[in-house]
Amino acid sequence: MNNRNKLRDFYILWSTQSLSQLGSSITAFALTLWLYEKTGSALSTAALTICSYAPYVIMSIFAGALTDRFDKKKTMLVCDTLAAVCTLTVFILYKTDTLMIWHLYAVNAVSGLMNTVQQPASEVTMTLIVPKESYQKISGLNSLTRSLVSILNPLIASALYALFGLGTVITVDLLTFALAFIALAAFINVPGSSKEVKESTLELAKEGLGFLRKTPMVFTLIIFMAGINLIASAYDASLPALIIPNPKGGSNMLGIVSSCAGVAMVIGSLLVTAMPKPKDRVKAVYVTMLISMSTENFILAFSRAPVLWCIGQIIGWILVPVMSANLDVILRNSIPVDLQGRVYACRNTFQFFTIPIGLFLGGFMVDNVCEPFMAEHAYSAVLTMLFGSGKGSGAALMMLILGIAGSLHCILFGSRLRKYHYSDS
């Protein structure tokens, strides 16, 4: 059997799930636009993201244990269906003119919980249906999906929302769900686990934590990425405050600069699918992040030109798929398939809990520390030369802080990760 036939199930699953992911993303973006129109509050829209991430932080460990207990395909189908029911509920409430803000928070929390269970099931499914020698390739394709979604999502969502309204956006989302559901239910064969799981959910969760405790390389990489996510999410919170107030910026320019990250990740994803396997995947993870952290933040901190903002985004994001692919291969090969659900779920808790913290800290630092500091020292010629003046200069200062913090994090953790080595040979 040639490699293409071996990957048939993966290609079907990947393509249809990617469309469904795009559909979910455009709905989330459109709901953000709708909510901001209703409230005019950045905090209200940020709360949507917090409601989605809260289940990740709280329930991931137990969700992974459930994944290992039950059939992976059925788990994905049930979770996707319940998430679609949430979306359908929003559609009905919107059409009957009874949609309220708290409805969105509640629906996002339930959808986030479903994603918390579905994500580790999906990760294990990929491991089961893909040959080991193709792990790097599928990691590159998954990165490509995330990149394309990040580019297309705001363009499609804003266009559909402006032309046809929220109802049409949700309809498109439900259609992509139906396509993905039919493909998974009818055409994808997911092999069963080789080991029957009899332990309780709590015991399985403890087993996932125990594996991380006994595998310091994997756990250290996860904690390293938690720090990266903290810096990156603080950056995400600071970027609008840097670009929108700038005379050469504005909301349209923010969209262009943000899309540059997606373009860079598309290029990086294509590189991953074509590049040879590195001699040491652990080194590839922390070196790529050091390059990203030590370039993008500093370029944006000291530049006032849109072209430099775009260049900074591209340099900062082009190596992210390389990091993701190498980390993904390490995890898939280091964790036994029968443990992957619970271990991936533990990974989600430890690696991603810093994202809402970073979003909060980034916004808090810009609004309450950096901008007031720059306003009080507006007379300083040195600070003005470095960060500009007026609103937005504090966000530029925050970029410098994040660049220093991110570089130090990579250097310090790099010294710890240097003792670990991983290659496919």
Description of each model-found segment:
Residues 11-29, 49-67, 71-86, 103-162, ...:
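Substrate-agnostic recognition of the 12-TM MFS/MFS-like secondary transporter fold
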Residues 81-98, 291-304:
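C-terminal ends and interior cores of transmembrane alpha-helices
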Residues 97, 124, 128, 170-200, ...:
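Helix-loop junctions on the cytosolic side of multi-pass membrane transporters
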Residues 27-30, 34, 39-46, 140, ...:
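Small-residue hotspots at the loop-to-helix junctions and early N-terminal turns
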Residues 1-10, 189-222:
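Juxtamembrane intracellular "pre-TM" segments in multi-pass secondary transporters
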Residues 75, 206, 213, 224-227, ...:
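C-terminal transmembrane bundle of multi-pass solute transporters/carriers
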Residues 32-38, 91-96, 152-172, 245-246, ...:
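Transmembrane alpha-helix termini and helix-breaking/packing motifs in multi-pass membrane transporters
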Residues 36, 89-94, 111, 184, ...:
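MFS-fold secondary transporters
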